[in-house]
Amino acid sequence: ANQITMEEKEKAWKPVSSKYLFRRPWLTVRCEDMLLPNGNHIPEYYILEYPDWVNTIAITKDGKFVFVRQYRPGLGRTSYELCAGVCDKEDASPLVSAQRELWEETGYGKGNWQEYMVISANPSTHTNLTHCFLATDVEPIDHQHLEDTEDLSVHLLTFEEVKQLLENNEIMQSLNAAPLWKYVAEHAADFEQESVEKVEHEKTETISHRINDLLYYQNSISRSLSRFLKDEEVET
């Protein structure tokens, strides 16, 4: 975590009093009586305490993006999402949490991992951070190990399909959209170049096939003409 700056110290709100209203494994709510540096007073300010979260942009060896699709009761919608979850207390690090979640939800693993970015869902009220990882060359190593609260399917999407989902606002989870947009911005040119090279390769192959076909027909005609001339000579 970044060190607190002098500006942050000067602008920090000071809790006069604090009390917990709600405690659950995945959510704790506390109410604070806040005093602002400008002298203003907020008698009820609610803070939501969460464990840190993780998500992963997982890409297979052949360039497919590993997504899950599941129903979200908050919005009442089904959506494509990155594999994500909570940092358990038993996990040694956010990286371990991300690798565990990918294995549990999709059965994918191995590959090359790096922390891609760290973001906050809502710094106004949330205490936690989300650690976003990039994992390349992942591969299926097992079946899913879903919890009782999970009901999701695994989908492999191309770069263009992911980009289209983002542009159509079909990836609604902001903690997913942020690292995905970053990845698209950084790698769009690479994929466009690959697409151009693929098209050029296909054109070259098509031309090559047509030339081979023409040569075949030309040889066939030559052989037929040769046989015809020989037959004419025999008759003569």
Where are these regions (language model features)?
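Local beta-strand/beta-hairpin segments that build beta-sheet-rich folds
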Residues: 15, 19-21, 116
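Hydrophobic residues on conserved beta-strands that form the core of alpha/beta folds
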Residues: 15, 29-31, 42-44, 68, ...
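Active-site-adjacent beta-strand/loop module that shapes the phosphate/pyrophosphate-binding cleft
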Residues: 33-38, 122-142, 155
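A contiguous pocket-lining binding segment that forms or flanks enzyme active sites
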Residues: 92-136
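Conserved Nudix-box catalytic region and its N-terminal flanking loop in Nudix hydrolases
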Residues: 10-12, 45-50, 55-100, 138, ...
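Acidic, metal-coordinating catalytic segment for phosphate/diphosphate chemistry
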Residues: 19-55, 61
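Nudix hydrolase/Nudix homology domain
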Residues: 4-13, 78, 115, 124, ...
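A generic structural signal for well-ordered coil/turn residues at beta-strand boundaries
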Residues: 23, 28-30, 52, 126-129, ...
